[in-house]
Structures are given as C-alpha cells and as structure tokens.
Amino acid sequence: DAVTVASHVRKDLDTLTAGEIESLRSAFLDIQQDHTYENIASFHGKPGLCQHEGHKVACCVHGMPTFPSWHRLYVEQVEEALLDHGSSVAVPYFDWISPIQKLPDLISKATYYNSREQRFDPNPFFSGKVAGEDAVTTRDPQPELFNNNYFYEQALYALEQDNFCDFEIQFEVLHNALHSWLGGHAKYSFSSLDYTAFDPVFFLHHANTDRLWAIWQELQRYRGLPYNEADCAINLMRKPLQPFQDKKLNPRNITNIYSRPADTFDYRNHFHYEYDTLELNHQTVPQLENLLKRRQEYGRVFAGFLIHNNGLSADVTVYVCVPSGPKGKNDCNHKAGVFSVLGGELEMPFTFDRLYKLQITDTIKQLGLKVNNAASYQLKVEIKAVPGTLLDPHILPDPSIIFEPGTKER
C-alpha cells in the first residue's frame, strides 16, 4: 500500500543518541509536570474511566482481539504529547525480544546528569506518580527477566500464526510476562493492571509490543494473507474503543477519529509513524518466515488454557507428571513452561474465545516420552499471584494437551 505520510520513526531505545535522550527526557518531564501523562495513564487502569454493568472499570482492553488496537492508540496518544512538548524523537521501543542483559539506563537509573544545569536530577523515567493516590510506581525485576530466550521463543510462535485472533492471544499473553517479571510483587507496580500505565516504562514496552504486531503484519503481507484487517471478531473491529472515542476525555483528534479497531491496522497512513526496522533479532521478514516454516516441520505438543479474568496478576507454571514408584504415585517435578496473566481490581471482565497454547515439547522429549501420546503423562498447574501467594490452580480450567503434527509428518 502507498504510504502517504510517515512523518516520524520509532527507534530502538538502545540506539538513541545522547541528544535524542536529552530531548525525550525533557519532553517527558514536561508532560509529567503538567499532569498530561497522568491523565493519559488514567485511560488504562485506575481510577476506572469506563463502565461495565453500572460499575467503574478500567478502559484498557485485555483478553480479546482488540487488545493490540487499544494499546496502539495508547502509545500514539503518548507520542503526540511528547512531540507537542518538543521531543525530537518519536516514542522509542524497549526491545525485550533479545535476551535482556540489564535494563536500559534511561529507565533503571534513579538520577541523571543534567548537562544544561550541570547537576544530578531525578530521572523522570524511573517512576511515575499515580493519579488520585499518594503513591509512585515501583519495580522489582525478577530473575526470569534476564538472560533467557523466553520472549524470543514465545514471539516466534505468535508470529507463526496466520489468523489474526490466533496471533493475538499468543502475542498478548507473551506481553504479560514483561509486566510480571519487571514489576515484581509490589502494589503500585508494573505488574498490576490498575497501576502499570503510570510507570513510564509502560509506553516503551508497548511500543515494542506494537512493533511485534507490525512485524506480524509484514509477515502476513509476505504470505499474501490479510494484514491490514482482521479475519475474525469482525463485530468488535467496528466498535469504537473507549475512552478514545469520548471527546471530553480525549481531545486528541487523531486517536478520536481512528478509535475503531479496524482503523488502527494502517498505522503508517493513519498515525504517521513507522519503525526503524521490522526485523526480528536481525532477521528480515523472508528469513523469519523461512525459520517459522522450519519450526513447523516436526510435531509439537502444547498445554492449552482457556484464560479469563480473575481480578489479579499471576504467573502460571506447568509441570509434567509421570508415574513414579508405587502404583498411583506421580513425579511432578518436571517444569515445562510458564506464562503470565495481567489483572487488577478494576479489570474489565473477559474470557478469551480460544485456547492459549504453551509449548511443552522440550520437556516431553527430555523425559523420553512421545509427543503424540498424551496418555503417558499428566499436567500439574501452579498459580502464584504477584505478591507471591499460591492460588487455587482451579481458578483456571484444567489445561488440554494439544498435539500439532509437523508438516513433514502429515
């Protein structure tokens, strides 16, 4: 499709120059001090600007196919504010697909050297004030966040999907893990749906989440499949998203005009931005598609979960149980995978319309089991809430075991 105007480029946070960082930080400090950022952050969680059955709820959309669209609008909202306040750069993205060695200085340092004033000042990206409460956001990075291929592996399976709704559920649940593992256990943290948007890292995270969607769109274009529209949930795609549709809450013209999910796909022409690259870990779209096809050649097994809201954030860990010792005894000490659920007191009720699939193939093979024989093992689920408390594993339906035969085995 012809691009009419893509007037700004979203860059990798790690590639910004010192001057670009200074400009971005100055603009962000402005929108913190005049409460613009707090007001935008209020769109997502607390205080609950939307209504559901007569109750205040968070406006953010989770657990449904319009999740990518809502958050594309949100990042665009922040980007417009930053550009209006003099930022020389668009919203950068925090690329967490590659294994994270350490958090970027922009978000991890409590202070920065203000070269204009020749002094150390508080870093506005380190935390954010929570609207309506005497609190600031905190982070408590967990060990799982660093030095592993989790995000890359999960991203590959999401990108493999050639149906928008199949892509969306894998994509959304993947994004939850960064919330959980960067936010940690505290109340006013990045891991709480109610408070996460007040943390400045939120829009950097969601710029990368949005870039992942843009990569999927390019893959779809390369595949000759729908990429600028959804081939599912058509009714939802026509319904404007709140509070972007509300001119009283959202005076921003562009996100108001394009508040229907169907209008968010064409981000270059409607929102006038593009990314510096749509490569994934230095792989072009054709290279990536070749890799995805190779990964589909051999059979894989998954634990399938029907996820719904529970009013809290949690990590869900899956273990494989195999017979051990006396009859009826099982050894369940074989961790097969983990995924995260993002929730909060004000979350809008949701139930995904299809199963989230967590791949457990490696563990099955390591145990010497056949991937196409689910009768030889069982699954055990452990659900741990963000504060660290164990929950009843039955708050989610028991998982299904799903075998997908390889393309070379059909």
Swiss-Prot record:
Q: Which InterPro entries match?
A: Di-copper_centre_dom_sf, Haemocyanin_beta-sandwich, Haemocyanin_C_sf, Tyrosinase/Hemocyanin, Tyrosinase_Cu-bd
Q: Which cofactor does it need?
A: Cu(2+)
One GO MF term attached to the UniProt entry: oxygen carrier activity
Detail which positions bind Cu cation B. Answer: H175, H179, H206
Q: Which residues belong to the signal peptide in this entry?
A: none
Membrane is among the record's keywords: no
Which residues are recorded as binding Cu cation A? Answer: H44, H55, H71
UniProt keyword Iron present: no
- The residue ranges crossing the membrane are none
Q: How is the cofactor bound?
A: Binds 2 copper ions per heterodimer.
How does this chain assemble?
A: Decamers of large identical subunits (450 kDa), each containing 8 globular oxygen-binding functional units.
Function in brief: Hemocyanins are copper-containing oxygen carriers occurring freely dissolved in the hemolymph of many mollusks and arthropods.
The protein's name is Hemocyanin, beta-C chain unit D
Organism of derivation: Helix pomatia
